[in-house]
Amino acid sequence: MQRFIKWLAVITSLDLLGVLLGGALVTKTDSGQGCGKSWPLCNGELVPSNLSMETIIELSHRLTSGSAGILVTLLCILSWKYYKHVRETKPLAILSFVFLVAQALMGAAAVVWGQVPAVLAIHFGISLISFASVILLACLIFEIDKKFDARSLIMDKKMKFHIYGVTIYSYLVVYTGALVRHERASLACPEFPLCSKNRPWPTQLHEWVQMGHRVAAILLFAWIVYAMILAIRHYKQERVVYLGWITSFILVTLQAIVGILVVYTNASLTMALLHSLFISCLFAVLCYLVMLGTRSKVNAKQTTSTENKRFFS
């Protein structure tokens, strides 16, 4: 059964990644109304008779989301049953399921009541939490903790501050990026790092949205670089923290490069999908560090309690 659950965790993670990338594809190709304003039917039909490319893309995204719902539900039930001894299993299972349902409802609302940019940005953010929760469940199922000896990890307050802070801030940056996409502001500023050679500063809404995202992303990059330097200096012996920040740095660097290429490739589909892929992976890595941070607090209390017992015995 454990082998089956491991395979299920991998397939579910890939399916949810497909949901995220599929959503980006729907937005990029303007296929949000590919099935009209009907949901869960497509143009009022179970199997649409007229299959345009927009209809195929939107319908594929719905089918992927539907299969993800089934897989996540099954994974949550099995992990709850067979891995309930692990402290984080139950909350992660609840998060995975609740946020998957929430993103499905948000997607349905976007179809029925119109493509509001702010709502679509929230839709992507909610999907990201569900994806990260499933990735963390998969890490628990594959016992990544044992491989990195992370169960007894203790971090200082400074490192935990950077982990929590970067993760929360990265989530806000994700919203600014999603807003750029849904406001169709990807090419509002044709130059980098400033808006344009003739007008370095934004003058209208779409330019402000684009430049706001750039500033937020640059700050995120700088924060991750600083946190990585701290990890290299003080946590080289704790491989999971050390490698976690190095991985985050690699992903945020790739994210930045692809973001710049989005501008210079006229927002090509490949660059847009890679942009969504790298930020999804980065957020999952940061969430794993958050889980380690919460565990560190418990480990510190247990260590203090053990030392007190030894002192008074």
UniProtKB/Swiss-Prot annotation:
Annotated S-S bridges: 35-42, 189-195
Residue ranges that the UniProt entry lists as topological domain Extracellular: 28-62, 113-121, 181-211, 264-271
Alphabetically ordered keywords of this record: Cell membrane, Disulfide bond, Heme biosynthesis, Iron, Membrane, Metal-binding, Oxidoreductase, Transmembrane, Transmembrane helix
InterPro entries (alphabetical): COX15/CtaA_fam, COX15/CtaA_HemeA_synthase, HemeA_Synthase_type1
Places the protein is found: Cell membrane
Amino acids binding heme b: 213, 275
Binding site for heme o: 61, 123
Pathway: Porphyrin-containing compound metabolism; heme A biosynthesis; heme A from heme O: step 1/1
Cofactors named for this entry: heme b
UniProt EC number: 1.17.99.9
UniProt record similarity statement: Belongs to the COX15/CtaA family. Type 1 subfamily.
Protein name: Heme A synthase
Phylogenetic classification of the source organism: Bacteria, Bacillati, Bacillota, Bacilli, Bacillales
